């Protein structure tokens, strides 16, 4: 398993080398997020691309049809290579590894801002600015609506969670009540 993991991480490293040589790292990061989003929203594509009953040329045609007009040509060809080498099952790990390597190269990071409601790009930018100062590197945030928050926000950057929401307040209150009840029952 380790060799297999190392093998497909090599694809991410190669993609990084290409994007650096083309001075197009940021565009490739955005294109990778686009690819992840398209496939996440169309799970049937994973079944199609990992199927041995669908010919390679047919897979290439589908990749062209979906992505050619929307992402860099190198990334279209990159998707064809991982489809050809039967690694499409690992597309997500490969692209996420590329994003991580590219962010490290650019001294930046990506995170997610979750709210119970839509927020303006100005507000998102202000959170990016605050977090960039706090973390000492450029932070880009992608917005996601999370109805479980009820109100407030949750920001996740580099496995750190910054949260101020009614949901988190209720969760904390529940934990404190349980702790208080356990302490009271012990007496």
UniProtKB/Swiss-Prot annotation:
GO terms for molecular function: proton-transporting ATP synthase activity, rotational mechanism. F(1)F(0) ATP synthase produces ATP from ADP in the presence of a proton or sodium gradient. F-type ATPases consist of two structural domains, F(1) containing the extramembraneous catalytic core and F(0) containing the membrane proton channel, linked together by a central stalk and a peripheral stalk. During catalysis, ATP synthesis in the catalytic domain of F(1) is coupled via a rotary mechanism of the central stalk subunits to proton translocation. The keyword Ion transport applies. Pfam families: OSCP (PF00213). Gene3D superfamilies: N-terminal domain of the delta subunit of the F1F0-ATP synthase. PANTHER family: ATP SYNTHASE DELTA CHAIN. Keywords: ATP synthesis, Cell membrane, CF(1), Hydrogen ion transport, Ion transport, Membrane, Transport. One of its GO terms (cellular component) is plasma membrane. This is ATP synthase subunit delta. The keyword Hydrolase does not apply. F-type ATPases have 2 components, F(1) - the catalytic core - and F(0) - the membrane proton channel. F(1) has five subunits: alpha(3), beta(3), gamma(1), delta(1), epsilon(1). F(0) has three main subunits: a(1), b(2) and c(10-14). The alpha and beta chains form an alternating ring which encloses part of the gamma chain. F(1) is attached to F(0) by a central stalk formed by the gamma and epsilon chains, while a peripheral stalk is formed by the delta and b chains. It is found in: Cell membrane. It comes from Mesomycoplasma hyopneumoniae (strain 7448) (Mycoplasma hyopneumoniae). It comes from the Bacteria. It is a peripheral membrane protein. Belongs to the ATPase delta chain family.
């Amino acid at each position: 398993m380790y060799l297999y993991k190392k093998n497909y991480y090599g694809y991410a490293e190669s993609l990084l080398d290409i994007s650096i040589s083309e001075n197009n790292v940021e565009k490739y990061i955005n294109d990778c997020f686009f690819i992840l989003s398209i496939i996440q929203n169309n799970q049937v594509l994973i079944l199609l691309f990992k199927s041995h009953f669908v010919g390679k040329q047919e897979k290439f045609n589908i990749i062209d049809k979906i992505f050619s007009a929307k992402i860099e040509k190198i990334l279209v060809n990159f998707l064809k290579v991982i489809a050809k080498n039967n690694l499409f099952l690992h597309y997500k790990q490969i692209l996420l590894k590329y994003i991580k390597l590219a962010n490290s190269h650019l001294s930046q990071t990506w995170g997610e801002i979750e709210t119970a409601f839509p927020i303006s790009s100005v507000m998102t930018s202000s959170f990016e600015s605050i977090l960039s100062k706090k973390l000492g590197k450029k932070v880009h945030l992608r917005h996601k609506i999370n109805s479980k928050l009820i109100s407030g926000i949750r920001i996740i950057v580099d496995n750190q969670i910054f949260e101020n929401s009614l949901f988190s307040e209720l969760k904390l209150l529940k934990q404190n009540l349980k702790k208080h009840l356990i302490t009271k029952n012990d007496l």
